[in-house]
Amino acid sequence: MTLEETNNCEIIDELIRQGRSFAMYRNPGEEEPHFLMQTCGEVHLIRKMEDLNGRTGFVIAPFRVTPQCPIILIRPDCHEIPSCAGNLHTPAQGDDAASYGQQFRSDRSLGAKKAYKACFDVFIRALRERTFDKLVLSRRMTVRREPGFSPAAAFYRACRRYIYSYVYLCYTPQTGVWMGSTPEIILSGEKGEWNTVALAGTQSLQNGELPQQWDEKNREEQEYVAAYI
């Protein structure tokens, strides 16, 4: 990492320890990541998608919005990584935010293996009965955090490794730390012209470049997504 990235890692990791709500992301093909942070008050807990209208910020949304699992909106009060995190005041959390954080953490402690097996049984039955052509079942794995692990350093490594993907790192006291990477563009556009991407299949980069040839399996998976859209 560069000296600037190393300094940024120390500050960003400190923001997490202080409980600051922020997001950092790098768009596909860009060199530099974007940063935004809410400097005061609580993040918005939004329980209906329509309530996002007219608002600006970084959105953290579940697949299914419920009163117990709402949409989180980080307000972009600041767009620059602070030069020093030591002088920042840690915002207080209200009862609403605290109760959501407790719900989120308790959900993660459920019997993941048992829940996954139950979901898999439903999925495989639906596929065998031809109710659906394609289903994707995610799973969760808990691992012990290594001493000295830096979420910010992992973000910068992901940016270098996944140059064609959207890479993000975000934190709120309600959700904890989330980091991910995806080549999928759900929606993009402006001035009345909007686009989406039908992306499916799994292939590795070939000599650092996107693959040009797709086999029948991957073409079939892509067609499922295109038909759904």
Identify the role of each PLM range.
Residues 32-36, 68-76, 89-90, 177-180, ...:
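Short, well-ordered strand-loop elements centered on a beta-strand within folded domains, enriched
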Residues 1-47, 143-148, 152:
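Short Lys/Arg-enriched alpha/beta "domain-start" segment
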Residues 20-27, 133-135, 165-170:
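A short, Trp-centered hydrophobic/proline-enriched beta-strand micro-motif
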Residues 39-143, 216:
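Non-catalytic accessory segments adjacent to catalytic cores
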Residues 37, 53-56, 65, 185-229:
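Cytosolic ligand/metal-binding cores
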Residues 25-32, 61-67, 171-174:
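Short, flexible beta-strand-to-coil junctions
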